[in-house]
Amino acid sequence: MKRWLATVLIVTSFAGCAPAGPSQSSSSVAATTDAGGRHPWTIPHQLRYATAEDIAGLNPHLVQQNVVSYMSSLTMAWLVKYDHDNRPIPELVTVVPTQQNGGISADGKTITWHLRHGVKWSDGAPFDADDVVFSTKTVLNPANNEVSRDGWDLITKIDEPDKYTVIYHLRKPYAAYVPNFFGSAGANPCVLPKHLLATLPNINNAPYNALPVGIGPFKYASWKRADSVELVPNPLYFRGQPKLQRIVFKIIPDRNTVTTQLQTHEIDLWTPVAAAYYDRVRAIPGVTALRQPSYFFSHMDFQNQHPGVSDPRVRQALRFAIDRRQLIEKVRHGLGIIQDTPISPKNPAFDPHIPTVPFDLARANALLDQAGWSRGPDGIRAKGGHKLVFDFATSSGTPDNDTIIELIRANWQKIGVGISVQHYPAALLFAPYASGGIVLGGKWDIIIFQWGGDVIGDLKNLFACTSFPPNGQNDPRYCNPQVDVAMAHFQALYSVKARQPYDDIVQQHLYTDVPDAIMWINEDIYAYNTDLTGFHPNQVTPFDDFMNVDI
């Protein structure tokens, strides 16, 4: 469900006040251009992208990271992708199945996928229904360290009547079938090549993961660990050849260095741009800064099974003691949509009736008193011999996070709560559960990062009792049976209008239970060379449409 929406994901991305639509600014530049009208620093048809995240792996079955989702959109095999307006479009299928076109049965329990003919993997092997069936079984194989299996357990039977048809039989209808069943939006798996992986007991340590073979406009050429990943056009892509001849994803952990390289024009594209750098990058000559509303949201997760925050009154108190307006003004340069539901206001599933929690230290103190946490001589509250001090995990090299944590620490001290900060490399912080990943392994008390909101507003993968890692991304380990019931009703309905009341119920419970505190809804910021053309990122899969991107 969530890769970038799914998604899964550092708070180095920026949060912003949502304008009515996207905005962009470009600094004027007086410079000579080549015969093609390009700046002298532009390398024709070669895009250089910068990411502050180190890369934990390239197989989206096993890794949840923004940059991996971007590369996967360009290289991997998806049944469905998304257009500029976040609408699903067929990729390896000839049509997106619906009840209206007969692709989904009247009872909602049968989904038929009609596959394209004549498609080849980037290594030349033919693609057919065998790959989809194999990939389905791969997701269902408990030996594989899948990032998410949300919805896959509903599949009771798979039919392959011919080499270009796959039929899923489900225990019950499933609204999130498009993004979750090999769709490019979210922390979802792609279709894998059976001919390369079928003989392995699991995919966890397969050599394939280092340079995956896929079906996209580009293919992997090299991965230099902690340095860069290079993509080149896939000559076998069924839609033809992209305009770009080379894409290099440069790993640059320090954002000051990224900004410098944007100024010296050693890179052409940077996203997500942190709020602290927005004014700087949009002032760089020859650079466009595109700003548009996001589906991503920044959040503070509480380890709900930790004795210090197992009581929802404590979590409510901690939320009251977060001065989000202060954080936005001091760290986010005034950019951020303050709200208390994880669903973006740009998503049709957004509930506008959820109230906004104010900054209120008096109410925070009162709630902690009610919960039985008393101040000690050092000012820190305690109960039953346990102090209210939390390990606060964050990613190394993210100064915005460090500033946010220190501002939070100052306010929490006023309510008798202490913080101990633990820094981790991004690759370890977001590593798979079985590889000792900090986030999914629950090796923290409190953590701030970001998630991508689901395309249809499905929250099961984040908050269901059955979605604890490694079976989902419910890393707060929150469990409310009433929420599970509402999410089950939501997922059983294909009609947006019919399922909305159930999503509203879920959002109301999350507001009251506070498994995590919503910090703000983000905006997506893209800083790029003004020579870049054809780049029109959407909210859910910004790199899905790259055929006509050029520089």
Where in the sequence are the language-model features?
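Extracellular/periplasmic solute-recognition and catalytic clefts
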Residues: G21-Q24, V139-L140, K157-D159, A221-P235, ...
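Ligand-site clamp/hinge motif
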Residues: T112, A206-N209, N234-R280, G397, ...
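Aromatic- and charge-enriched surface segment that lines or borders ligand/interaction sites
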Residues: V96-N145, I167, Q261, G308
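Gly/Pro-rich hinge or "lid" segments in bacterial periplasmic/extracellular proteins
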Residues: D83-R87, A185-P242, R246, N256, ...
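Detector for C-terminal structural segments
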Residues: V29-A30, K224, S228, P233, ...
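Surface-exposed binding/hinge segments that line
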Residues: T42, R149-A198
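N-terminal lobe/hinge region of extracytoplasmic solute-binding protein
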Residues: A50-I104, K137, L211-I215
